[in-house]
Each structure stands twice: as structure tokens, then as C-alpha cells.
Amino acid sequence: PHQETRTAESAEKFLKRCEDAGITITAVFGGFEGESYADIETTVKTVGLVPEETRSARVQEMKEISDFAKLLGCDTVALHIGFVPEDRESANYKNLLASTQDLLDHIASNSQQLNLETGQETADHLLDFINDVKRDNLFINFDPANMILYGTGDPIEALKKVGKFVRSVHCKDGTWAAEGKRGKEWGCEVPLGDGDVGMENYLRTLDEIGYAGPLTIEREIPEDRERQKADIGQAVDLLVSLKEKIG
């Protein structure tokens, strides 16, 4: 939500629209001016709380988003934190830890949790970061396609590793980049069921880890709204049929 819309009046109006549509708000995602997903290199430089030059301002903005989520009655905020530095002894990593702890303490004061979206780190590095932060309101929004799109690991194996921290999920699909280009070039997002995630296996694994929360469909083609709506509709049908099959 943009700054000008983060008001009590806007929250009241939005809640009314959601109520009329039968929609329950399960998470409020934060995003920032200046972020770009044009390619992986640009994503590293611009996304989330990792870029040092924008970190302080973005932490403050996430605090305001947390306050707005509270007005909406939502106990979960989420974001792409960015590419967490690999060197856990570096000053950049330690400063990111401190900023994340500061943000989480504010979020906790609103009786909320923060879910980090997967994809930009391997499962092991994400677990290291969560454990280093040492806050009990830091969890994961698991997006299986992002593991493929970023080339950071098999999504099912990653889900098994991080399962105890998963509090929300995306249902999104994608195909791997060519061998030798994974992690350097994007994979390709595709309609649910057409990619390399393996949706039935994904849902079965969610059951195995005890996940019983919402299955949030994400289809990131805002430039083609009609196709986006059609793909989301097909995704609903696929998930319903798979859930019936799995039981």
C-alpha cells in the first residue's frame, strides 16, 4: 500500500470492499519505490531491505505498513527482504540483522508476524538468517516457483527443509532457466500446472509439513489482465481437483 493510502479512512473503505466481496485479508505485502525485477542482477541491487542506501527508509516504511495492516485487522505482513549477503560475518550482514530485528520488534508490538518470501536465497541460507535474527515472529511465505525462477534449489526439497517456519504460501509455477544459466538468468513463470514445480507433489508436501493455511494463487502478468484472470480461474480449478484427489 502506498503512503497516501495508509490511513484509517482508507483501511475502513478497503475492509468494506473486502467484506462485500467475501474476501479475507491474510497478509499485507510490502514493496518499495525503486525496486526492479528487470533481471537478477538488478533485483540484487534494488529489492528489499538488503540495499544499504535505502535500508533505513524502507524499514521505516515497513513499520508504517505494519501499522496499516493492524488497521485492517491483519496479523501478518510480508516482503522480499532481498538477496541476503552470503558472508554471515560481514558488516552488511550484521547490519541487516540489526535492521530486521528492529523491524520485527515493531511488528511484534502490533501482535503481528513477518513472513519472508522465498526464492532469493537457498533454503539453508534462509534458515541461517532466520536463526541468526533470533526473533519468534519471523516466518516464511513459501513460493515454490521462485526457487526455480531464481535458480536457488529444488522447491520440494526446500519446502521440506524450511517447513517448520512456513506460515503462508503462494501457488505459482515456473520453468528452469537453461543449464549453466540458473541463478544468472530468470526462469519463466507459467500458468499453474504447466511448470516444473509439480503441483500435486507440492500440495502433498504441504500436508506432510502440517500446513493448513490459505493457498494464495499468484500470477504475475499485470500487463495482460484478461489472461491473468483466466489463468487464476484455471489455477482454482486445478487446486480444487488436486485437493479432492489427495483427500
Residue ranges and their predicted role:
Residues 25-28:
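Conserved alpha-helical segments that form or flank metal/cofactor-binding pockets of metalloenzymes
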Residues 6, 10, 54-61, 95-99, ...:
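Soluble or luminal CAZymes and related metallo-dependent hydrolases
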Residues 19-20, 36-139:
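Active-site acidic/histidine proton-transfer and metal-coordination neighborhood
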Residues 1, 32, 83-84, 121-122, ...:
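Conserved beta-strand edge residues that scaffold enzyme active sites
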Residues 1-18, 81-88:
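Glycine-rich, proline-tolerant flexible connector loops at the mouths of alpha/beta enzymes
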Residues 12, 19-22, 36, 101, ...:
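Histidine-acidic metal/acid-base catalytic patches
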Residues 3-5, 44, 180-186:
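Vicinal oxygen chelate
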Residues 2-7, 53, 88-93, 151-154, ...:
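Short, solvent-exposed loop/turn segments at secondary-structure boundaries
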